[in-house]
């Protein structure tokens, strides 16, 4: 039987030990659940108007990923427990841009699909944006667990994109991600 260590903290600081490579490895295997301070959303041009901060970090270890530079000091994966507050803030942005459509990117700081079986945050986002008139949601992933998303009523307000590469690139540079065949099977399901 495998034991997963759980640590409860009052502080928001996550302290990783060792040299930089050790901290990176440890961080990639650390899941943090926290509350996101509701402040201004970051711009996400050109793919969307705003980032939708549901998750940060990624369990993948793609050697070329910009998250390695953006989140080098915080390589851990962080799930935000206050998604309803985040959606409410998104609604404020939608209202402020009416009558224009407002697009939110769910994967600017993470690959949230990898965590969907545990969080259901993408399901919540898809259902939320399905109810908005002028809000749209999009995300990209290398991961393949879309089963919980397939039957959702999305009202064509969500766009799911999958990142593809040949197996040689996936094996050499996209560590801890599904192979091409699984990604292609996922595209067929979508």
Per-segment meaning from a language model:
Residues 2-38:
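A broadly conserved sequence feature marking short terminus-proximal activation segments
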Residues 181-190:
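Conserved C-terminal portion of the radical SAM core fold
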Residues 23, 32-44, 48, 63, ...:
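Conserved Radical SAM active-site core
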Residues 110-114, 168-177:
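Surface-exposed cleft-lining segments at the edges of enzyme active sites
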Residues 52-62:
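Cysteine-centered iron-sulfur cluster-binding motifs in ferredoxin-type domains/subunits
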Residues 80, 176-180:
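Short, conserved loop/turn and helix-capping segments at secondary-structure boundaries
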Residues 162-168:
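Short, basic/glycine-rich phosphate-binding loops at helix/coil junctions
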